[in-house]
Amino acid sequence: WPEMLDSVVAAEQPKNALDLGAGSAVLAIALAKLARIPVLASDIDPVATEVAAGNVRLNGVDDLVECVTATGFDHPVFADRGPFDLILANILAGPLIELASEMARNVKPGGSLILSGILDRQEDAVLEAYRAADFHYIRTLPREGWVTLHLKL
């Protein structure tokens, strides 16, 4: 993750990002510190969102990271804050596949996705779903049976 995030941020200079399925907001915090840009951190679990908000405060990026509880993209904040230059999602392959078309509606043309939480044997299915949603494959970063994907709209 850090290597992929560093290279995408350096190459693309995103201005507005989303961490979907943020959990404890580790990626949102890392991105806010790295790029000094606004990051929306969203999770389906309200307890995770509370923990994330605490972590954001502890890391001194509460001026940059906003935490919300939402199922997928079902929250008005996405219309207010999006579309995004960069979306990070570290969630399971099944939900990633289901969200492919919504990802396309919420990322700017030319914007990037960094997707992880994908077992290497699930990579082809995830790529198929995102290609069908008009994303272009950039690269895969494999690690111990898991993959992180970089895709662009």
Where do the PLM segments sit?
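S-adenosylmethionine
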Residues: 44-153
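Conserved SAM/SAH cofactor-binding pocket of Class I
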Residues: 1-72
